[in-house]
Amino acid sequence: MVRKFDFLVIGSGIAGMSFALKVAHKGKVALICKAGLEEANTYFAQGGIASVTNLKVDNFEKHIEDTMIAGDWISDRAAVEKVVREAPAQIEELIKWGVDFDKNEDGEFDLHKEGGHSEFRILHHKDNTGAEIQTSLIETVKAHPKITVFTNHYAVEIITQHHLGIIVTRYTQGIKCYGAYILDEKTGEVDTFLSKVTVKATGGCEAVYRQTTNPLVATGDGIAMVYRAKGVVKDMEFIQFHPTALYHPGDRPSYLITEAMRGYGGILKTKDGKEFMQKYDPRLSLAPRDIVARAIDNEMKLRGEDHVYLDVTHKDPEETKKHFPNIYKKCLSIGIDITKDYIPVAPAAHYMCGGIKVDLDGQSSIGRLYAIGECSCTGLHGGNRLASNSLIEAVVYADAAAKHALSVLERYDYNADIPEWNAEGTMNPEALVLITQSMKEVNQIMEAYVGIVRSNIRLIRAWNRLDILYEAPARLFKRCKASRELCELRNMINIGYLITRQAMERKESRGLHYTIDYPHADKK
């Protein structure tokens, strides 16, 4: 089946839904969601969204400086200035769409402070800001007559000249995107979605790691598809490991203990109740995430333990319950009263700072294709993302991409020559077993060899094992009917390869990329 839309938005988190709402008055929008609308990464973001709002003590220059420091001075300054200066207007837009940020007794925003921030500037809704934003946007999107939501639809490939029989390489000029082939999981058929403009808002890729705070749908689909289509992908070595995921064996994904809990006064301690962050950074538990994650990783290895602890027992119990009601309930459900007990925590893969390279308008290297949100690489994060800068980046770049797309929409039309998907092939139980086991192997490889601390030997081993793993799904994809499981495996191996290759290419330790073979930053 062939479907035609002015705008094809693949991904339904804060970035995808914001873009859809900003362009829907000018054309028909298809919003593709690989699972349910609530399963986007946005829904699971706890801490909040960063923006300068209290001008009595804060200003843009401070937020810019904090972002550059966290990014280890390799962030794109233009991207940083854009996001920081345009943030307040996008906060107003979110409020207009129904998002309810917490206020204090004076009616002003109740601001949190998180690691790496010099001021209180984190807007939040209790300790489930992402869920509040996602729920508000879902209601607004569903009410819009020009936005059609396709749940349980999975993007298999973006459509370029390659599908017209033209050879496309990484040196081909003028690659263009004409839409995407989308698998309807209900029917098992792959439909052809033609569009004038296509937007990737597919989120992150942290499900390639065994320990992750991300929903397991975060398999890097958008990044992998654009890479295979010969688009530019950048900074994949910079995987952020959140320092404080709840340690509870068997949980996958891991439950996130928000950064805001350390901003609130939480202290990292060893099993015997001793503080340790003073050995690593003068900012103690409020140091940027890469420093805290490496410190925890080192303490765990020194002691042969699986976790450390976060202590908020010295804080007022009622205040703790008020600020962190969901964390309180979650921990209580496994027998931990955070007002009396230490919280067991360990690092887990949390955020991809790199992705599909885009310009200040969110345009990728492929014409008519934009990338926004976590799947994109705007340059904002550099070597490490500052806490709570991701949600604001998503809405600022959704706005930029929407404005640019609307300004060029009339130049584009549908490409009527695109062939429909070749649906031949079968899927047998043996193939499904192979896929499931291969996914587990990818998780094990990435966790063991491409984690918080890396080395040349570990990276080479990961490369070789991923290379072996790639052959089977590549053959299966040619002879089997397309399925979500097979496509996800192929994407996960592509993502593992990209992270490993770009980590091997960076001959220094910088931001989130730390290698024992090159322990210092190259200051050239």
Q: What do the PLM-derived regions correspond to, one by one?
A:
Residues 35-68, 72, 240, 251-255:
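Conserved N-terminal glycine-rich FAD pyrophosphate-binding loop of Rossmann-like flavoproteins
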Residues 225, 231-338, 343, 395, ...:
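An anion/pyrophosphate-binding glycine-rich loop and adjacent beta-alpha core
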Residues 157-169, 178-187, 336-380:
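FAD-site-proximal beta/loop scaffold in flavoenzymes
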Residues 7-31:
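N-terminal Rossmann-like FAD-binding beta1-loop-alpha1 element of flavoenzymes
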